[in-house]
Regions:
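Exposed beta-sheet edge/beta-hairpin loop segments within beta-rich domains
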Residues: 109-129, 136-146
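Signature of extracytoplasmic/envelope-associated structural regions
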Residues: 89-99, 116-119, 162, 169, ...
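Acidic, gly/ser/pro-rich intrinsically disordered tails
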Residues: 1-4, 160-197
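OB-fold ssDNA-binding interfaces and closely related basic DNA-contact patches used
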Residues: 1-97
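Beta-strand elements of well-folded, non-transmembrane domains
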Residues: 33-35, 135-137, 157
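OB-fold/S1-family single-stranded nucleic acid-binding modules
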Residues: 140-160
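Short, basic/aromatic beta-hairpin or loop at an interaction surface
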Residues: 94-111
Length: 197
């Protein structure tokens, strides 16, 4: 098996790491890396594909690369944002060469390294995470690709599931002028109003 490695910190999206996706029976997570790290990670993935191709196609026709484990993010109007999300997955189970079905699931840890086993725990979009994974390049019928196989997730900064705090998800951008929310100031204003009654 390929060596397990880790990503740098990134923002999590569409994480299903405690309970598998019902339709495909896989655990999944996408992460958005800083733009400075995106090209570096893409190059690392491409090098793994190139190694696999060179190893198995010497003197033969090069296969077409059909699968990269990332997708380009689009805004609400369908325009590319320049951001890339990398996709990691793990099958809920697999069958060994001996015909034995093996169940598996990713390990999930908090920032302090404590294992999280609560099946109701959810990672909301925008949470800051690191992902442990290994690359699985493949060749099949003249085509090549690579999958990023999920092993574990460390949650550094949790955004609670169901609370989408990423304005870009709704097509909003930061405005230079206008309202800026200050929780302490709002709390003081509410206290003042309450005292008046």
């Amino acid at each position: 098996m390929a060596a397990t490695t880790r990503t740098v910190k990134g923002q999590a999206y569409w994480a299903k790491v405690m309970v598998p996706d019902k339709e495909y029976q896989t655990f999944n997570i996408e992460i958005l890396l800083d733009k400075s790290k995106q090209e570096e990670f893409k190059a690392l993935i491409q090098s793994e594909i190139d190694k696999k191709v060179e190893m198995h196609t010497e003197g033969k026709k090069k296969p077409k690369v059909e699968h990269f484990p990332w997708r380009i993010v689009e805004d609400a109007e369908g325009m590319e944002t320049g951001e890339i999300r990398f996709k990691f997955n793990m099958k809920k189970s697999f069958v060994t060469r001996d015909g034995e079905t093996v169940e598996q699931h990713p390990q999930v840890f908090d920032a302090k390294g404590n294992l999280i086993t609560d099946k109701s725990f959810r990672i909301g979009n925008g949470s800051v995470v690191k992902v442990a994974y290994f690359m699985a390049p493949y060749l099949n019928k003249g085509k090549a690709g690579v999958s990023l196989r999920l092993k574990a997730v460390q949650v550094i900064d949790l955004v609670h599931y169901g609370v989408n705090s990423d304005p870009k998800a709704f097509g909003f951008e930061e405005e230079e002028e206008g309202f800026s929310y200050d929780k302490e100031q709002m709390d003081r204003a509410l206290e003042s109003e309450t005292e008046d009654f």
